[in-house]
């Protein structure tokens, strides 16, 4: 089986037939140069699945789910609150924190924060790619940028 892993946001089930979006289809067909009947992995919050390519037409890849490889992971919550920083450093921080198991990112705007706007879609894409590469099943959530005074974090109840 190949090492290609892609995030698929929709529900997956055994013997299901579906199509990848345009970007993922381009990645598989043009970048990875996969052919019909080759196998790759898809994952979402419910688990990881083995999929087989049925066909590639008009740059859209059609696949069939063969079997489930792994069940959903139960992980402890690990949040990372950070002040947005310049792009390259922020991308690196998101990648490494995702690899380490962070489950939620909280961008916080402080009085002296230089970068005031974040492109949430771009950051989500970076987080998804880091999840694909690090063999994670669950993809961390990124919240919108908030002022520190609006953040309410309650301490979890402890069993002891």
Predicted regions mapped to residue ranges:
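N-terminal positively charged helical leader segments and presequences
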Residues: 1-71, 121
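Conserved functional loop/turn residues at catalytic and ligand-binding sites
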Residues: 33, 101, 157
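Residue-level signal for inorganic ion chemistry
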Residues: 37, 97, 127
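Ordered, amphipathic secondary-structure segments that act as subunit-interaction surfaces
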Residues: 74-116
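Short, well-ordered secondary-structure micro-motifs
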Residues: 117-119, 150
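Anionic-ligand binding region
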Residues: 126-134, 139-150
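Single conserved hydrophobic/aromatic residue that forms the stacking wall/gate
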Residues: 151-160
């Amino acid at each position: 089986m190949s090492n290609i892993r892609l995030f698929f946001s929709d529900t997956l089930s055994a013997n299901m037939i579906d199509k990848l979006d345009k970007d993922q289809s381009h990645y598989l067909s043009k970048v990875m140069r996969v052919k019909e009947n080759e196998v790759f992995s898809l994952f979402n919050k419910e688990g990881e699945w083995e999929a087989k390519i049925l066909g590639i037409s008009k740059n859209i890849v059609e696949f069939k789910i063969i079997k489930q490889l792994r069940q959903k992971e139960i992980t402890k919550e690990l949040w990372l609150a950070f002040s947005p920083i310049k792009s390259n450093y922020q991308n690196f921080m998101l990648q490494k924190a995702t690899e380490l198991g962070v489950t939620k990112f909280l961008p916080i705007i402080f009085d002296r924060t230089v970068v005031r706007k974040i492109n949430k879609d771009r950051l989500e894409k970076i987080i998804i790619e880091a999840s694909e590469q690090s063999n994670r099943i669950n993809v961390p959530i990124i919240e919108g940028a908030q002022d520190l005074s609006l953040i309410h974090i309650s301490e979890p109840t402890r069993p002891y």
